């Protein structure tokens, strides 16, 4: 059996911890067979455990503590700790792994609830499970969501050659914000979502770049403004910090994406990728 989970990009505009979409990078997991102990084959680096400390296995064991050990193979082209949902993809793979080995037929809603209870917020795990663009809220243990299709728009990921820990990047955020700022953020997010629904990427782009929650605190470490200026010079609708970074995502007219990729690739040592939106969430094969 095989499991495939897409990468995700989240935190569009003021949709902090709420708005995310799936993209065409993947974590792939193959169940090779039963084993005396958990054994994970991968070439993702020495920092990724190859035993039951691996996030995929640790997640599966949270759901089914007595889950029988297996030998599995993991491959992934999702950049690690770069704001493209690498940890969420591992968590979702772990939920699916538990379901397959224990022969549990959990509903999508139950899987979403499990993922949110572990992750704490739905912006990455929801599109990883559902695919597409997902608008969601997780409050007092209850998840509500709407899955949408993204408008026809090009997507570029500017992936710097340095990692940023989500935990560390959350520590730089304030614990509170002024009421008037919260009202402003709410109204910006409302119109941004409405613009995406109408396919008005010009208006949506303006609003995506009016984040009030995290970018101004996190971009002291990331070259967002510089990349934003370059991208707009070549016709981009919007740039934003994907997740906690370090990836900067760029939305642009499809016909402009190749030029933006070319220009940004010459700018630094970052890995610049032209991506596409993934309508499918986690899938199993075989």
Language model features by range: what are they?
Residues 25, 84-107, 129-134:
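DPxDG-like acidic metal-binding loop motif
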